[in-house]
Amino acid sequence: YLPNNLERESRQHAIFLFMLCLWMRGGVESDTATIFLKKFHEEKPEYFNPSMYFDRRNITVQGLIDNIKAELIRYRLNQRVEENSIGWVYNMRKLVRHWDSDPRLLMIDKPDFEVLSKRIIGKTRGGNFDFVNEDSPNGFMYFREKMASMIAYFLMDAKLVQLFVTPVPVDFHVLRLLTSNLIIRVKGKDVE
């Protein structure tokens, strides 16, 4: 499912997987999103270059959002397109500004999950929907615990970062199944 024009085990490979996570939040078939994102990368790889979203003259942030939104729709990635176009621009800008345009650096030190979560999860939107927290290296838009685990496993599986211990990405439906079949039991805030 990787784009033909993507060098394996490269920074661009890591960026592709990082951006793919925007569609892994539920509500869309993972394979479908991957196929459409693959085609988008093969035809317009420049949109996967984080610096495109930071040092653009005469283009506002809203202009960048509108531009990527139109491309996402064109490539049939319209599931949550309003959110994902904003997240795309915000996350690319944060990668440029704080992580040398490279998602692998989020995990270069094989962090424990608490550290990884702190780096990836954080407040990103204000009450009036302005970007906030851009000055901090921590916090990517629409990334929660499941996505922090998922990007870690994506990058480890692709041999883009060294293996380290992190929880598996589990969503609400899997947890509901595990608890209803008494595979795990929850007492208060503790899991047995």
Each model region followed by its residue ranges:
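HhH-family (HhH-GPD) DNA N-glycosylase catalytic core used in base-excision repair
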Residues: 1-192
